[in-house]
């Protein structure tokens, strides 16, 4: 039986028949070669079907696997290969593991695992080693002797790293660091550009961090998800003056030296303005969302220069944002390298160069503009924004009139004497309390329907009956049975995986 220990999007780490995946399986370890057939994880397949001279069918199916034959040929056609893989996901979901045969390029394996491949056969990789092609971290080098045993160690080490990256949520960073194979890079780009909706539906709502070292990070599913939210759904607080600021290396931005200078110079005037930070690869970060994912959890090389793709992204996002969120006045306190962003501001604005000597001028301009303006409770505005961002617009009317109580160094959202949510400052998110669970049940949001049992530390996939489509891995969820609240916790799988799998942790119960 398939037993997933961890998921990252379509990538899976676990065991089937005591064979760990993802892995490269060799003779005697999950795969056995006969004269006329091959046994893979207990299922027999004719050799001529697995290694055809000419591809007559795109996939083969066994009890546990969907097999893509002749991978060596398909890797040279990344668009076709990605299409086949995505068709398999659409048809089989998480019910079967995917194997690809005949891969000769070990450097394509991390990307293929990201796309959802769990097994590779070692036949052609072994042949490469026997011919003296040595695999190294920097590419292939030619030796004058058999290096297949060295290559086996290299591949084993690589697979352990991939397995660990799935488990700790850093697989996307790994595949971006391991860009040796141009075909692998092409496959990831195709997945990002052409299959965003598919990957977004299974991509975690948060990862431990984002190392945004390449332009490819612009197209990560989680970052596109965030940018779409800001462009299409975000609602600003009531302040009608916007202050545009640059990002900082330290996160959240408000703790950086540069932003602390601005905060100190403006003092109480900040209650009358809305601060908006411009950055890449995230685009726009309202101050009220700076503690959330991804804004607090990314790192980018700061060199004072922007790629053209980054400029286009930021300008489009600013234009869309400003089109939906109207301000009476926009003040841009930015360095020269961000001047291009003002082209996307559709109404009156004033630009002040971002430097310490201009802080007094900035204060004077804001003092002049806020005359008669309305002060905003910044903490309430922040928590309203985070609640809306995390759960959706529907939640705000249900918590309207709440108070904020601080206990055990945590802020709590309280209404009618009941603690509804607890704010986790380190993660920039709210945790659901049982007192608010009925809100989710009545609105059909973030629900995992389970069998009739009382959950303890974990709910396994076998105990899941159904799950709402809005659930992504790492989402806060409510556990329910026949309309009765049974608990709350954190999703460890996307909704579809919870429903289709029989093994593995679906929800970590709090």
Swiss-Prot record:
* Source superkingdom: Archaea
- List the catalysed reactions: 7-cyano-7-carbaguanosine(15) in tRNA + L-lysine = 7-N-[(5S)-5-amino-5-carboxypentyl]formamidino-7-deazaguanosine(15) in tRNA
Q: Which GO terms describe its biological process?
A: tRNA modification
**Keyword Lyase set for record:** yes
How would you classify this enzyme at the top EC level? lyase
Reported EC number(s) for this entry are 4.3.3.-
Which spans of this chain does the record mark as coiled coil?
none
Any one Gene Ontology molecular-function term assigned to this protein's record: lyase activity
Question: Does Membrane count among this protein's keywords?
Answer: no
Q: Could you tell me which residue ranges the PUA domain spans?
A: 427-510
Query: Pathway, per Swiss-Prot/TrEMBL?
Result: tRNA modification; archaeosine-tRNA biosynthesis
Write down the Gene3D superfamilies for this protein, in alphabetical order. Answer: PUA domain, Queuine tRNA-ribosyltransferase-like, Uracil-DNA glycosylase-like
InterPro entries given in the database record: DUF5591, PUA, PUA-like_sf, PUA_sf, TGT-like_sf, Uracil-DNA_glycosylase-like_sf
Could you tell me the keywords of this UniProt record?
A: Lyase, tRNA processing
Q: What the protein does?
A: Functions in the biosynthesis of archaeosine, a modified nucleoside present in the dihydrouridine loop (D-loop) of archaeal tRNAs. Catalyzes the addition of L-lysine to the cyano group of 7-cyano-7-deazaguanine (preQ0)-modified tRNAs at position 15, to generate q0kN15-tRNA, a q0N lysine adduct identified as 7-N-[(5S)-5-amino-5-carboxypentyl]formamidino-7-deazaguanosine.
On assembly, the entry states: Forms a robust complex with the archaeosine synthase beta subunit RaSEA, likely an alpha(2)beta(2) heterotetrameric structure. Formation of this complex highly increases lysine transfer activity.
Family in the record: Belongs to the archaeosine synthase type 1 family.
Name of the protein in its database record:
Archaeosine synthase subunit alpha
